[in-house]
Amino acid sequence: MTNIRKTHPLLKIVNHSLIDLPAPSNISAWWNFGSLLGLCLILQILTGLFLAMHYTSDTMTAFSSVTHICRDVNHGWIIRYLHANRSSMFFICLYMHVGRGIYYGSYTYTETWNIGILLLFTVMATAFMGYVLPWGQMSFWGATVITNLLSAIPYIGTNLVEWIWGGFSVDKATLTRFFAFHFILPFIITALVMVHLLFLHETGSNNPSGIPSNSDKIPFHPYYTIKDALGFLMLISLLLLLALFTPDLLGDPDNYSPANPLNTPPHIKPEWYFLFAYAILRSIPNKLGGVLALVMSILILAIIPLLHTSKQRSMMFRPLSQALFWILVADLVTLTWIGGQPVEHPFITIGQAASVLYFTLILILMPLASLIENKILKW
């Protein structure tokens, strides 16, 4: 008798995606981050659902409702801290996933790559709106500063900001709509993930060597299901370690003070995973220029496939490109550090230098290094 997973219309889809899927035999741990992101998304939706049952999106009660969740709701504190810290894990996995795509040339699957960029933007928007919900000092001022950036758009900027705010400042209307969007966006992300996987399974997965692996495939189960399970275990262990021992390590102390529109914090900054983009924004003295640089710092990923000049797909055998890639990683770490520092000398200069280097590496140096490598190999 034929196995039900191969005949049942629904189980057949699961079977072709998770069990009998032909996968390259040599994919490394860098390919684990996709499944880890899926795990993060599912767990974020679950914890978020339980938090939404007790949260109230009103400026008068939002802060106290979060306090109520932590103090009075059964296991509310752990649900809240898991939700907050898993967003950090989400972005760590996300950046590693994108980094792996750049290093091993996965961006040559343009459909999958472009849906991935759309996913990145959507996840960033969701995380930003989630950061506003506890209605602490940094939540309020972060929302004010970041939404205000849209006022740099010529002609329609001011109207656009007031339309998003639902008034003349960040207030009750803003909080209510941010909560509504924060609730609905993860489900839109889930739909986009399905499309992302659909495009990926059209081409099959890339592998570290960048060479087509059609002649050497193995079934996804049990080989990669076990490998993913180990990744899940490590991620959950790290998350529990963070949420149970140092739950506020990645948060901002200002968020323990209720939002006060009359008192500005000395240093307004977003969550740590947005600091690299925030540093690029601040490094340009002009408001519109800064906003364009901020958007381009992420949107630049969309033109990476067009800048691929190498005859090889992966960086595995390209030492020059490897060196530049790791300089890019170090540059992003520097930008993240600068984004968390006050706007004063020498941080301004370091931020400007790191921002220029970021764009120079991606737009000029990396394509140039690929051409030099082609020349060395006489290709």
Swiss-Prot record:
Gene Ontology molecular-function annotations: metal ion binding; ubiquinol-cytochrome-c reductase activity
Cofactor note: Binds 2 heme b groups non-covalently.
Residue stretches spanning the membrane: 33-53, 77-98, 113-133, 178-198, 226-246, 288-308, 320-340, 347-367
GO terms under biological process: mitochondrial electron transport, ubiquinol to cytochrome c
Protein residues bound to heme b b562: 83, 182
UniProt keyword Cell cycle, yes or no: no
Cofactor(s) this protein requires: heme b
Main localization, broad class: mitochondrion
Keywords: Electron transport, Heme, Iron, Membrane, Metal-binding, Mitochondrion, Mitochondrion inner membrane, Respiratory chain, Transmembrane, Transmembrane helix, Transport, Ubiquinone
Compartments, as annotated in UniProt: Mitochondrion inner membrane
CDD domains in UniProt: cytochrome_b_C, Cytochrome_b_N
Residues that, per the record, bind heme b b566: 97, 196
Binding-site residues, a ubiquinone: 201
Note: Heme 1 (or BL or b562) is low-potential and absorbs at about 562 nm, and heme 2 (or BH or b566) is high-potential and absorbs at about 566 nm.
Function (record text): Component of the ubiquinol-cytochrome c reductase complex (complex III or cytochrome b-c1 complex) that is part of the mitochondrial respiratory chain. The b-c1 complex mediates electron transfer from ubiquinol to cytochrome c. Contributes to the generation of a proton gradient across the mitochondrial membrane that is then used for ATP synthesis.
Family statement: Belongs to the cytochrome b family.
Protein name: Cytochrome b
Natural source organism: Pronolagus saundersiae
